[in-house]
Amino acid sequence: MNSFKTINLLLILSFLGLAACNSSSDDTDTASETEVETEIDTGTDTDPDTDTPLTTGILHSAYYEFDSENVEVVLSGDNVIIETNGLPNHTSPYWSSDHELFVEPTVTSYEQMAPGNIDDFVGTYTLTVANSPEKASSSSATGLGAIGIAVSGSVIYNDEEGPGIALDNAVGSLDYNGAHTGPQSFHYHLEPISFSEDDSNLVGVISDGFFLYGRKCNSTGDYPTDLDESGGHTSTTQFTQDADYHYHIQNELYLNAYYILFPGDYQGTASAIN
């Protein structure tokens, strides 16, 4: 009888031991998952010992604002590779009339519109920039063609319509997002109100790696007063706890009605958008 009780007691103790092990294992698994989630940081944290930006393995969280259907963003070491199909994620009269995002022209007309449709373009644009870009020793002029990639998927142009030709005479062809087609693709010249209208929203990234925001500064909720000649300054944003350099659409009227996206020079070292 005593032998039977002893066996039962041993079985109970063994069961309790296994339960304790399983509980410990569950706690360990949960802790491991928490650590993994914590390590996948989308911010721009710094090393607490050195205040050095952690560029390797941590993608700047602003890139998560880009439309994932049109834009692919890949962190490669200290660089970011951005590839887009060049198509916007919003409506426009420049889509083919049978496209689901087509709308009738409002601020332009069929007579004024540039030739071609958005969906005529078949290809990609690729830009490689530093994940933590730095200002160059001197500024450099933008050129014709794409100078940045917008969060919508389309590309950003400067304030010229051709070599030394101001945008003035082409404004009538722009849709309500300040964009039109030609010579190869749909692109923005003016404030794109579908995703930034008199606010601090992210507009895109310029080809020197610095982000372009709307006319207002997120850190103050108002128009920044300390912008340089390129519309840039250093402050915190909705994506950073530490201040960093970035551009804004300048709150200066163009032709008494519009706001040019990026009329200034690059303040960093620009890469080609191919």
Residue ranges, per PLM feature:
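Bacterial N-terminal signal peptides that target proteins for export
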Residues: 1-9
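C-terminal motif of bacterial Sec signal peptides marking the signal peptidase cleavage site
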Residues: 17-20
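Bacterial signal peptide processing site
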Residues: 22-25
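Solvent-exposed N-terminal domain segments of exported/luminal and surface proteins
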Residues: 33, 37-43, 47-165
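Extracellular/lumenal glycan-associated surfaces
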Residues: 125-129, 150-154, 182-195, 240-255
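Short helix-loop boundary/capping segments
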Residues: 165-177, 181-223
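Short, low-complexity cationic-aromatic patches
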Residues: 172-184, 228-243
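Long, compositionally biased interface segments
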Residues: 230-274
